[in-house]
């Protein structure tokens, strides 16, 4: 409650009024000494005196009009403009004296005069329910009297009127004052809807703007230009009791009726009237008699029960006639009064809930029509008899209370259960759920009818997809049924909201400046924070750069030291190599340019496309790795509002229905997996135990991982999953053990066969020795390509043919079964191992055949025997390695990398031995590791040196050692006494030997062809021998041992190596026809795996050592048995990958001092001269008694197979030139 504003301002002229009431026409009761109360109405309603309160006959001249109230504490000076008192056209022109019959208590200089005790506080509701009547008293025709028509009292004496006072501003609502008085509020307190008005209960005098204490009567015209406009008080104007106007002079049409545009009032109407372009006002234009009546007010409880008008909606006006007497003809008016009062007591919110916004204009039109209808009632003759009893007021209050209760029940908001469920409950008793009372709703409902046609079969769907389909398939009516705030007419623009213009104006005039200051302060702090962070960052960056410079310098120094140490170490190694006389790879490449050519065999795994290489390099890039692994750091939150004012309400796991979640106890126990799904689950579980995500993926997404988990635990007791896993592992172990057992049994069977073959081979050798004693002594040596002894002896060609066919079938079968081939290889290796245990094999003629060890001791080491020895050792090592397998890994440790060069020095290119020494690397891993790092580390030199020391293998042959080549076979002289019928065919250019020991091979008839009919006939005896029919050509890639020396087959002829170049020369010289020689030579399959070509072109110097006798120990025995010198027998040894020497250089680059000669001492004939000779013979070169010094070859075609093929193609012309050079060198 605020105090009234000062009664006048500085510069205002002091108004004159009668303080002591000298005029007898004015009742003395009006000028009592009671002061203005300290209320929000600022004394606008005067309190009656004690006399007036008790004397009903005293009637004031005017009725007091209740005025609107304002909020306390508001200022008065700038709130509303005041019209000038000197403006004659102003209807609210002030006067210098009061023209009312009664005057308010107190004066404008003493407004705080004590009020009478009969004053009670009143609200707008109490004003509506209370009836205020006045008695018309004749007080004379003074200009100050209301009865007199004057400039101070423009109303006539015979009628009452309602004066319409428009607002000074065009958009301000008008107000109405009874009896033509320009009633205007004194301060902002009059506008507040929150402050109640005081209502006089007894005889009340009227107050208008022309009263002495009225502030607007003293207002100046310049105040109308004030910036803040007067707030509306139309809500209270409707509560004023007015009279109908019969004088048309000052009557104006209401503003709400004249203006056709309507805008809803906002909640802030009391602060800014300019926000509204239209106000709705109601005025019950009823005649107000001036007869004095007795007024009774309701009790305090009744007053409190009356609802309060809301400021947001127009009030409902009372259309009753409170001054009408209770007569039969006025009952209708009383009923309308009761209805009007009932409506008045409804609050604004209740009215808004009853009637939506679009209906408000209709309500106002109805109110206006009702007011006009009531005003037409003729009550002129009854004005003096109008009176009101307490019964009328009490009944009206009672009706209003009942209507308020009904409205409260009707508009009471019913809270949804969802809202109540969100309240947190902490009582354990309330949280406890009775499991026995749980019920499960049957969710087995069918799918709804699709709104759109479904193409194809999409059902059944998983749970989430099904729910999504249901939501999309809902009709619009069902979707919007629960949308409480959905508007009937959609709002297209934000400015269409009723609060838009109001909030915009408030922001511009009030809140905008405050917000601007606050936001600018926040931005300023944020900017300062950023600057400080930048300074900190720059300081840290400088510090980091300094540390990086220090570390860079340190790493550079360490790098320099490391490079220097490596350079010194490299120099020491180079110096050591020079001292030892080892050539470096670079020096050797300069000496032998042909050796620098790369191998034609390429590893395709080393070649990748550019995109893949870029991807690999990108993955290795540390910057890329860092970028991929780095976390995305969000920016700092510098805004304090975002940093501190943001709040988050976590409703995760909020239980809104405790029975709903508890019902899982009944639902989860049921398993709905089908048999097919269960079988898929079992298969997936056995593959991925307890990895339910992978199991769900294995099932094809039929079930989610969560459902798989539930299914596992539901069926855990019925299905023993652990036992299923154990059984599966047992089966896997049993299958692996069965495979190992079968492999072991196969190897045992092969060992038994090997034992039998050893006994048979011993018997075969004894038979051969016996047959040699019965043979003729003068038998020329022949080349025999024998085989290792195995199986039954073959004495006839039929048996040989049968054996060839059997072996051919075995070859075809073994090519399809690689495992069987490996087993046979192991068996063959065991045969070789057992056969090499005997150091000397004695024949009947006293000839001793030494094993490789004995040959080494005597200074003679046959090449093929030595290779056989190494191959047997390799096979044994492989067998041991397979029997005790170790874990193989492609990772090379530091120890293995350091040990590898030492193993290369020890074993050279024998990868299997190096693999066995390392233990964790296979033969392929060792070979690949050598190929990758040989050029960089200079290992090729080590391998060449080791191979040369071991068997003279050149470095170039290491690269081709991986190609499967048929190895050379040792020449064994054991067939001097074999009968001609039992001698097999020996080669392409060979006939049967018939001459003596020293007879040259040229004496043999050259017409004998290897495939001719006389190929197997003896020249002297002409004894017929059954011809050997050749089987169809086959393509075996592996040679197997044979028990007897059989006749050569196509395979033997194709793969037979020709060991001696001088033998080839003699054979070529014995050919009479060059065309015949070419045809025989073309019969060789050059396209094979270079077996014959290698022997033809790659005959090294060590091929000259083809005898099993040494010059120091067995020269005498050879003289006693001359027939044994020229018989050469070649044995087939196991097919191993031991590197062979390349003899292209020996063919094309003869070594000085290494001439060859026939056994009779004459040199070899040139190639052209040998063509004119007779039958070709094949004498054996004499065994060497001293080691041969080897010089590096001048030309080497071992790394260039195309050059080798070209050399073979030009053999007739090229060989003679090379052999002539060789002869000249001798």
Swiss-Prot record:
UniProt biased composition (Polar residues): 31-64, 132-143, 150-170, 264-275
Chain intervals with Low complexity compositional bias: 81-103, 116-131, 202-211
Positions with biased composition (Acidic residues): 748-758
Q: Boundaries of each SANT domain copy?
A: 668-720
Principal place of residence: nucleus
- Chain spans, region Disordered: 1-219, 264-331, 569-605, 732-796, 1172-1194
PROSITE patterns given in the database record: HTH_MYB (PS51294), SANT (PS51293)
Task: Kindly indicate whether the keyword Membrane belongs to this entry.
Answer: no
Q: Which terms does the record give in the GO molecular function aspect?
A: DNA binding
GO terms under biological process: cellular response to starvation; DNA damage response; negative regulation of meiotic nuclear division; positive regulation of stress-activated MAPK cascade; regulation of DNA-templated transcription; regulation of transcription by RNA polymerase II
List where this protein forms a coiled coil. 539-591
Question: Where are stretches of biased composition, namely Basic residues?
Answer: 11-27, 732-745
Tell me the DNA-binding residue spans.
911-934
Q: What top-level branch of life does the organism fall under?
A: Eukaryota
Where are the Phosphothreonine residues found in this chain? Answer: 796
Choose one Gene Ontology CC annotation of this protein and give it.
Set3 complex
HTH myb-type domain boundaries: 884-938
Please state where this protein is localized. Nucleus
- State the InterPro entries in the record: Homeodomain-like_sf, Myb_dom, N-CoR_corepressor, SANT/Myb, SANT_dom
Q: Which UniProt keywords apply?
A: Coiled coil, DNA-binding, Nucleus, Phosphoprotein, Repeat
**List of residues that carry Phosphoserine:** 187, 395, 1037
| Residue spans of biased composition, Basic and acidic residues class | 280-304, 569-590, 759-773
| Protein's job | Part of the Set3C complex, which is required to repress early/middle sporulation genes during meiosis.
Assembly and interaction partners: Identified in a Set3C complex with SET3, HST1, HOS2, SIF2, CPR1 and HOS4.
Q: What else is known?
A: Present with 396 molecules/cell in log phase SD medium.
Name of the protein this chain belongs to = Probable DNA-binding protein SNT1
| Source organism of this protein record | Saccharomyces cerevisiae (strain ATCC 204508 / S288c) (Baker's yeast)
- Taxonomic lineage from the root: Eukaryota, Fungi, Dikarya, Ascomycota, Saccharomycotina
């Amino acid at each position: 409650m605020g105090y009234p504003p000062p009664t006048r301002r500085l510069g205002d002229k002091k108004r004159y009024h009668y303080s002591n009431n000298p005029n007898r026409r004015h009742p003395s009761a009006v000028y009592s000494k009671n002061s203005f109360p300290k209320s929000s109405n600022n004394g606008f309603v005067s309190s009656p005196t004690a006399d007036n309160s008790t004397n009903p006959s005293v009637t004031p001249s005017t009725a007091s009009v209740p005025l609107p109230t304002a909020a306390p504490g508001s200022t008065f000076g700038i709130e509303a403009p005041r019209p000038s008192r000197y403006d004659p056209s102003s209807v609210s022109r002030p006067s210098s004296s009061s023209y009312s019959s009664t005057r308010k208590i107190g004066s404008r200089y003493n407004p705080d005069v004590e009020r009478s005790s009969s004053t009670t506080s009143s609200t707008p509701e109490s004003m509506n329910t209370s009836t205020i009547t006045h008695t018309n008293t004749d007080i004379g025709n003074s200009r100050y009297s209301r009865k007199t028509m004057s400039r101070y009292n423009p109303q006539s004496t015979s009628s009452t009127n309602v004066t319409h006072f428009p607002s000074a501003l065009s958009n301000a609502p008008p107000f109405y004052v009874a009896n033509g008085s320009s009633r205007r509020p004194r301060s902002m307190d009059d506008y507040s809807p929150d402050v109640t008005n005081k209502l006089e209960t007894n005889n009340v005098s009227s107050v208008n703007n022309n009263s002495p204490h009225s502030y607007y009567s003293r207002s100046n015209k310049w105040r109308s230009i004030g910036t803040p406009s007067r707030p509306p008080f139309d809500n209270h104007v409707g509560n004023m009791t007015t009279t109908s106007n019969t004088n048309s002079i000052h009557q104006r049409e209401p503003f709400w009726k004249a203006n056709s545009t309507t805008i809803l009032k906002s909640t802030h109407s009391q602060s800014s009237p300019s926000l509204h372009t239209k106000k709705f006002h109601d005025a019950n234009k009823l005649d107000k008699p001036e007869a004095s009546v007795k007024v009774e007010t309701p009790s305090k409880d009744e007053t409190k029960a009356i609802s309060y008008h809301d400021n947001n909606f127009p009030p409902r006006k009372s259309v009753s006639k409170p001054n009408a007497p209770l007569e039969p003809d006025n009952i209708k008016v009383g009923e309308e009064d009761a209805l009007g009062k009932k409506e008045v007591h409804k609050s604004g919110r209740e009215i808004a809930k009853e009637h939506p916004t679009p209906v408000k204009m209709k309500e106002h039109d109805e109110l206006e029509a009702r007011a006009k209808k009531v005003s037409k009632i003729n009550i002129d003759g009854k004005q003096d008899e109008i009176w009101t009893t307490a019964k009328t007021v009490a009944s009206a209050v009672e009706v209003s209370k009942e209507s308020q209760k009904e409205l409260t029940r009707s508009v009471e908001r019913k809270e949804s259960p969802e809202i109540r469920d969100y309240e947190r409950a902490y009582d354990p008793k309330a949280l406890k759920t009775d499991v026995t009372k749980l019920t499960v709703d049957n969710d087995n409902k069918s799918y709804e009818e699709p709104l759109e046609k479904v193409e194809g079969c999409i059902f059944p769907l998983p749970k989430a997809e099904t729910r999504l389909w249901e939501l999309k398939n809902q009709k619009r009516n069902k979707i919007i049924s629960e949308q409480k705030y959905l508007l009937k007419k959609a709002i297209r623009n934000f400015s269409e909201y009723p609060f838009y213009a109001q909030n915009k104006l408030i922001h511009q005039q009030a809140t905008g400046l405050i917000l601007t200051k606050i936001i600018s302060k926040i931005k300023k702090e944020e900017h300062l924070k950023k600057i400080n962070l930048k300074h900190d960052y720059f300081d840290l960056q400088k510090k980091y750069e300094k540390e990086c410079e220090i570390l860079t310098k340190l790493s550079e120094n360490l790098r320099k030291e490391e490079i220097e140490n490596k350079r010194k170490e490299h120099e020491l190694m180079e110096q050591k190599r020079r001292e030892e006389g080892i050539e470096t790879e670079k020096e050797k490449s300069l000496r032998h340019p042909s050796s620098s050519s790369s191998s034609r065999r390429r590893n395709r795994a080393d070649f990748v496309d550019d995109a893949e290489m870029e991807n690999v390099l990108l993955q290795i890039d540390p910057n890329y790795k860092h970028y991929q692994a780095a976390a995305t750091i969000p920016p700092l939150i510098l805004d304090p509002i975002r940093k501190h004012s943001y709040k988050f309400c976590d409703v995760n796991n909020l239980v809104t229905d405790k029975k709903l979640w508890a019902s899982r106890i009944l639902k989860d126990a049921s398993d709905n997996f089908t048999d097919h799904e269960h079988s898929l689950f079992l298969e997936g579980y056995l593959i991925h135990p307890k990895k339910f995500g992978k199991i769900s993926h294995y099932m094809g997404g039929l079930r989610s991982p969560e459902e798989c988990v539930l299914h596992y635990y539901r069926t855990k007791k019925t299905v023993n999953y652990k036992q299923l896993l154990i059984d599966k592992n047992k089966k896997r172990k049993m299958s692996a053990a069965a495979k190992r057992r079968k492999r072991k049994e196969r190897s045992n069977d092969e060992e038994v066969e090997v034992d039998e073959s050893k006994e048979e081979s011993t018997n075969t050798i004894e038979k051969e020795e016996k047959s040699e004693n019965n043979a003729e002594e003068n038998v020329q040596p022949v080349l025999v390509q024998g085989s290792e002894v195995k199986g039954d002896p073959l004495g006839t060609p039929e048996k040989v043919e049968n054996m060839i066919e059997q072996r051919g079938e075995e070859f075809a079968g073994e090519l399809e079964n690689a495992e069987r081939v490996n087993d046979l290889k192991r068996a063959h290796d065991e045969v070789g191992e057992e056969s090499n245990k005997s150091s000397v094999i004695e024949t009947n003629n006293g000839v001793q055949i030494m094993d490789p060890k004995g040959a080494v001791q005597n200074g003679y080491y046959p090449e093929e025997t030595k290779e056989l020895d190494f191959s047997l050792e390799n096979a044994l090592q492989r067998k041991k390695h397979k029997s005790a397998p170790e874990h193989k890994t492609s990772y090379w440790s530091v120890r293995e990398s350091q040990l590898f060069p030492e193993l290369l020095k020890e074993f050279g290119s024998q990868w299997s031995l190096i693999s066995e020494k390392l233990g964790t690397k296979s033969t392929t891993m060792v070979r690949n590791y050598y190929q990758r790092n040989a050029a960089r580390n200079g290992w090729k030199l080590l391998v060449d040196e080791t191979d040369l020391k071991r068997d003279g293998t050149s470095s170039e042959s290491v690269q081709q050692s991986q190609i499967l080549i048929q190895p050379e076979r040792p020449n064994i002289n054991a067939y001097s006494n074999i009968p001609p019928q039992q001698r097999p065919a020996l080669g392409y250019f060979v006939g049967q030997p018939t001459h003596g020991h020293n007879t040259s091979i040229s004496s043999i008839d050259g017409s004998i062809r290897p495939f001719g009919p006389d190929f197997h006939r003896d020249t002297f005896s002409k004894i017929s021998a059954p011809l050997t029919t050749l089987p169809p050509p086959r393509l075996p890639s592996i040679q197997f041992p044979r028990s007897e020396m059989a006749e050569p087959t196509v395979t033997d002829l194709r793969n037979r190596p020709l060991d001696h170049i001088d033998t080839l020369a003699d054979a070529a010289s014995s050919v009479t026809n060059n065309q015949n020689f070419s045809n025989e030579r073309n019969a060789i399959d050059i396209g094979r795996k270079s077996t014959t070509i290698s022997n033809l072109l790659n005959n090294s110097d060590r091929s000259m050592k083809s005898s099993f006798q040494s010059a120091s120990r067995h020269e005498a025995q050879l003289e006693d048995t001359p027939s044994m010198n020229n018989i050469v027998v070649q044995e087939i040894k196991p097919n191993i990958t031991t590197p062979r020497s390349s003899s292209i250089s020996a063919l094309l680059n003869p070594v000085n001092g290494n001439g060859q000669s026939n056994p009779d001492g004459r040199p070899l004939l040139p190639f052209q001269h040998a063509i004119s000779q007779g039958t070709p013979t094949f004498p054996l070169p004499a065994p060497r008694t001293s080691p041969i010094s080897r010089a590096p070859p001048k030309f080497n075609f071992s790394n260039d197979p195309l050059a080798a093929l070209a050399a073979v193609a030009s053999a007739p012309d090229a060989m003679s030139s090379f052999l002539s050079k060789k002869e000249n060198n001798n």
